Amino acid sequence: MEIHNLKMIVLYVEYDKTKYKDTLSILMNSLEKISCKKQVIVINNDNNSQSEKKSEYYVLSGTNRNWEFSGWQQGYDYAKSQFDFDVVLFANDSCMNHGKRELISHKLSNDLLLKIYNESRFYGNINLIPDEYGDCFFEEKNVKEWIRTDAFIIPKTIMDKIQKIDYSDTYNIYDIIPNNITREAFINNSYFSAGLTNFLLDWFEKLWHSRFDPFENIKLFQNKTKAIINEKLLSYYIRKHNFKTLNHLRL
């Protein structure tokens, strides 16, 4: 396929326009260098917007129920009902923050997009939990590898197999992290392997740029854990169907 015949859907979830006020304009400018057919859908998760069609993109009113993942799922379901497309670019409003800009702004090109499509490859930032944590399982699924979901591209051939982006309806976060959970109860939970449990605690308390005490903010603990599970299950199902990946850090 030639690049001008390729059709791409862009699903952009925004929540905090004050903190990330320039992200959408930077993203739109970055897309101008791509010669394929593009349709941009903005999912506004701030619960204070209406669905509408603007000159450059559609706007859908999101719920923020499961952060960007429910927004992407809503946008993808809408796109499937309205458009024909070959690849999907997923992004949230932090995709140009914390040194992340190069994934889209610097490395995305016509040649790379054709490679993603022709070889049915996932493109994004793929990370591996350090070996020091040992095995990392969620409900018997090996989730040692995980995808940073500020921005990534998936061909429709992969989406047709994995079927969804938001996996939060496949488990109950309140069973995993009840509102009254203690540190001891979480350490002894039956959902995560010991390695994954230890990694999550280290991530929240030491490694994440917005580190916090999870047992002092249970709501954030629940929501952030849901987001991490979604990232890990996305990677798990891509591997399960034997699709190859392109890690932008190695290009």
Residue ranges and their predicted role:
Residues 1-251:
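ER/Golgi luminal nucleotide-sugar-dependent glycosyltransferases, focusing on the catalytic module
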